[in-house]
UniProtKB/Swiss-Prot annotation:
Bilayer-spanning residue ranges: 3-23, 29-49, 60-80
Subunit structure: NDH-1 is composed of 14 different subunits. Subunits NuoA, H, J, K, L, M, N constitute the membrane sector of the complex.
Biological process according to GO: ATP synthesis coupled electron transport
Catalysis performed (reactions): a quinone + NADH + 5 H(+)(in) = a quinol + NAD(+) + 4 H(+)(out)
Protein name according to UniProt: NADH-quinone oxidoreductase subunit K
The keyword tRNA-binding is assigned to this record: no
Top-level taxonomic group: Bacteria
Family from the record: Belongs to the complex I subunit 4L family.
GO terms, molecular function: NADH:ubiquinone reductase (non-electrogenic) activity; quinone binding
Record Pfam families: Oxidored_q2
Gene: nuoK
Subcellular location: Cell membrane
HAMAP family in UniProt: NDH1_NuoK
EC id: 7.1.1.-
């Protein structure tokens, strides 16, 4: 069996990679993917801790987090497509949707 610390280390590395993606990239689609990577790394850590405690509640919470993340992606991508159709760019520095 793989030790719990390996899963936590993998989760931390994935979360760090997601944070680096959010900080360095300006493409809205890449930002969405980086945020999803961060959510999935948090899910991995939560499942790891639930597995270590032999508790199913952590896995149930992760299931609901995945459902909410899927809804977030659907709304976010719909907004991104609408913005791309009007502005013809996905660069977050050039998108000023509130300015009109």
């Amino acid at each position: 069996m793989v030790p719990t610390s390996y899963y936590i280390l993998l989760s931390a590395l994935l979360f760090t990679l997601g944070v680096v993606g959010v900080i360095t990239r300006r493409n809205a689609l890449v930002l969405f993917m980086s945020v999803e990577l961060m959510l999935n790394s948090a899910n991995l850590a939560l499942v790891t801790f639930a597995m270590a405690r032999q508790d199913v509640a952590g896995q149930i919470v992760v299931f609901f987090v995945i459902v909410v993340a899927a809804a977030e992606v659907a709304v976010g991508l719909a907004l991104l497509v609408a913005i791309f159709r009007t502005k013809h760019t996905t660069d977050v520095d050039e998108i000023n949707a509130l300015r009109g």
